[in-house]
């Protein structure tokens, strides 16, 4: 049955596409995102281009991919019968940012833009980075997100991570994920930096609680491909029902 939603998505095919962009070109968009920062280890920047009815083209958003937030993420997705990772580091990307101009979402023909762009992004990564097999993405529960747009694109949901204590860079206003982030302050290890945060009021760090994040994955070859079936069979975590936002009283 042809639905209104399917007609809207069909219309997007003629008016929306992705185009490679430089870091400088996406920064203006990233600064408007709620995270307010440009991610590290970026591999691919794409502008979301909208061809208007008058023929002019506007950049209405950006989608950014790169290495995973946690360097060991690739080892924690799927394993073979002997417990060896089915994926190598270069075979896993993370969708690091997706930002769309608020005014673009008000255009009737772009009402399904976010989910459509994610689908375009997966196809673009498969085309431009053929070695990549899996794209992971996270929804920040601390921001009240459940990943509704990923659910709309049939992403595989692998659950929510636990709340953890993490180092926070006070000057930059961001979490510490990599050793080089503490080394620039003269610390050799994360443990040294954590001890400094606990005992030194003037430490560049403080220890905060990082709320767990909802994790989703996309298998770029499709779940019905031989590769997709192999990854599905080896998933370390069970596939779970999609989370929903609590209903307000």
PLM features: what roles do these ranges have?
Residues 30, 42-67:
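Conserved beta-hairpin
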Residues 1-14, 224-226, 244-249:
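Charge-dense, intrinsically disordered terminal/linker segments
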Residues 15-16, 209, 238, 246:
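A positional "C-terminalness" feature that preferentially activates on distal terminal regions of long
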Residues 6-42:
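Short amphipathic alpha-helix that is part of the acyltransferase structural core
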Residues 217-222:
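Short beta-strand-to-coil "C-cap" segments at the C-terminal boundary of structured domains/repeats
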Residues 19-20, 67-206:
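Acyl-donor binding region in acyl/amide transferases
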Residues 229-249:
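Short, cationic low-complexity segments
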Residues 43, 211-216:
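Short hydrophobic/aromatic beta-strand or adjacent loop that forms the aromatic wall/cage
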């Amino acid at each position: 049955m042809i639905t209104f939603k399917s007609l809207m998505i069909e219309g997007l095919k003629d008016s929306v596409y992705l185009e490679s962009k430089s870091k400088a070109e996406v920064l203006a968009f990233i600064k408007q995102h709620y995270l307010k920062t440009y991610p590290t280890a970026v591999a691919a920047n794409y502008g979301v281009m909208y061809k208007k009815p008058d023929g002019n083209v506007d950049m209405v958003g950006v989608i950014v991919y790169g290495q995973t937030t946690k360097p060991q993420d690739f080892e924690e997705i799927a394993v073979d019968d002997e417990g060896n990772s089915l994926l190598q580091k270069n075979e896993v990307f993370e969708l690091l940012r997706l930002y769309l101009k608020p005014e673009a979402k008000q255009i009737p023909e772009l009402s399904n833009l976010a989910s459509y762009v994610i689908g375009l992004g997966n196809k673009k990564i498969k085309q431009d980075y053929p070695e990549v097999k899996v794209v992971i993405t996270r929804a920040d529960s601390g921001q009240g997100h459940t990943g509704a747009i990923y659910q709309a694109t049939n992403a595989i949901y692998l659950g929510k991570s636990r709340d953890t204590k993490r180092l926070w860079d006070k000057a930059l206003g961001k979490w510490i994920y990599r050793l080089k982030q503490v080394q620039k302050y003269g610390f050799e290890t994360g443990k040294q930096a954590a001890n400094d945060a606990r005992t030194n009021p003037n430490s560049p760090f403080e220890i905060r609680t990082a709320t767990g994040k909802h994790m989703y994955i996309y298998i770029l070859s499709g779940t019905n491909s031989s590769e997709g079936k192999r990854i599905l069979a080896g998933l370390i975590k069970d596939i779970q029902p999609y989370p929903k936002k609590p209903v307000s009283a």
